[in-house]
A protein has these predicted regions:
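Iron-sulfur-associated redox domains of electron-transfer enzymes in respiratory
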Residues: 1-119
Length: 119
């Protein structure tokens, strides 16, 4: 099992007004360089067909996932099936974070808190 969580950022096509105050590249680079994560990556839209295929290829039953995206309830609804298809319990292995309508600094803080809680 991976000792460090993996951070996945879904940017909702880059057009979601909820992310207008977020500097995506500052966030992702801060997470990958300064936080205790296995790695950090960006996907343009996890809740569509190619996002579903990506998750099924990407997910492994050996670690925790922190997903920065929209409302956690929506993440659960849209992504839970992909996790279950590969035998991973979404409720136990995913920390869904709503990073919409946050400044870059606020989003960094929220991700850092999740990383610390995952230890």
């Amino acid at each position: 099992m991976s000792a460090k969580p993996r951070f996945v950022m879904c940017i909702c096509t880059g057009q979601c007004p909820g992310f207008k105050s977020l500097d995506l590249w500052e966030l992702i680079n801060t997470v990958r360089r300064e936080m205790d994560v296995e790695y950090a990556l960006v996907h343009p839209q996890l809740c569509v067909d190619d996002g579903d295929r990506f998750l099924k290829d990407y997910i492994k039953d050996d670690g925790l996932y922190i997903i920065g995206a929209c409302d956690p309830k929506m993440q659960r609804k849209m992504m839970k099936e992909a996790f279950e298809a590969v035998g991973v319990d979404f409720e136990k292995m995913v920390i869904p974070l709503d990073l919409r309508n946050l400044s870059t600094e606020e989003a960094i803080k929220k991700v850092q808190e999740a990383v610390e809680a995952a230890k």
